[in-house]
Amino acid sequence: MSRSSATLIGFTAILLWSTLALATSSTGAVPPFLLTALTFTIGGAVGIAAGLARGVGLSVLRQPWPVWVHGIGGLFGYHFFYFSALKLAPPAEAGLVAYLWPLLIVLFSAFLPGERLRPAHVAGALMGLAGTVVLLGARAGGFGFAPEYVPGYLAAAACAVIWSVYSVASRRFARVPTEVVAGFCLATAALSALCHILFEPSVWPVGSEWLAVVALGIGPVGIAFYTWDIGMKRGDVRLLGVLSYAAPVLSTLLLVVAGFAAPSGALAIACALIVGGAAVATLLARR
């Protein structure tokens, strides 16, 4: 598989993640850890079924413990700290801090062998971050980082660091088959179910809400993690980091099309910054 093909496959994860908000809005009052448990169970099943269809047996899950620490720590760790951040701090501020992960991916990629971090990559990532600031700030009517929410900000920062480290470190585990991600998903589902039992009331999906849960499990919480794994292991990590800032903008555009949000000047500015950042990272970095 070529580097450009792997990058394109990795970008499909970003496209799928942009549907998260719209799909999640159709799951009703299902609490976050229960929703995570349900969707990751489906996502894990999708991976196992796809592997078996290609002749890859369950023996592929026999991996050294560092592989499991990396995978479960990345998937479950990110979601645990993200949900904690949303409970401990206002969603806008928590979301902004959490969305430092694309920039961190770009910066951390400099530590990978054979990768060279160019100023254009950093500039593109900063433009993407600026677009996210404009978009999230407009939604919330501004930001107000208050001292009493420091635990929430720290939790959001933790999830940003965890996901960026997981993503970049995937290159270190390039020989581990992508099918192993199914095991990460199922382990994340089990730990999320435990957190649900300990911390949340049980509100199960009803009627058409199950369709949204299944769609999440197949797409943004299923296929996306497998394609992201391919992109991180074989694609352009720096470019995928910059392109990740497209997710919140595409997510908002989908909400506008579906009638859940209104178009705004902030959305247009965010689009311009993120598209411009991607262009800077793609074109100037080649010179």
Swiss-Prot record:
Keywords: Amino-acid transport, Cell inner membrane, Cell membrane, Membrane, Repeat, Transmembrane, Transmembrane helix, Transport. GO terms for biological process: amino acid transport. Changing Y78A: Shows moderate effects on the transport activities of both threonine and methionine. Residues 25-31, 87-90, 140-149, 199-208, 259-264 are periplasmic. The chain crosses the membrane at residues 6-24, 32-54, 66-86, 91-111, 119-139, 150-170, 177-198, 209-233, 237-258, 265-284. Changing W101A: Exhibits decreased transport activity for threonine, but not for methionine. It catalyses: L-threonine(in) = L-threonine(out); L-methionine(in) = L-methionine(out); L-lysine(in) = L-lysine(out); L-glutamate(out) = L-glutamate(in). Pfam families: EamA. It comes from the Bacteria. The overall structure is basket-shaped, with a large substrate-binding cavity at the center of the molecule, and is composed of inverted structural repeats related by two-fold pseudo-symmetry. The central cavity functions as the binding site for a wide range of substrates. Amino acid transporter with broad substrate specificity. Can transport various amino acids, including L-threonine, L-methionine, L-lysine and L-glutamate. This is Aromatic amino acid exporter YddG. It comes from Ancylobacter novellus (strain ATCC 8093 / DSM 506 / JCM 20403 / CCM 1077 / IAM 12100 / NBRC 12443 / NCIMB 10456).
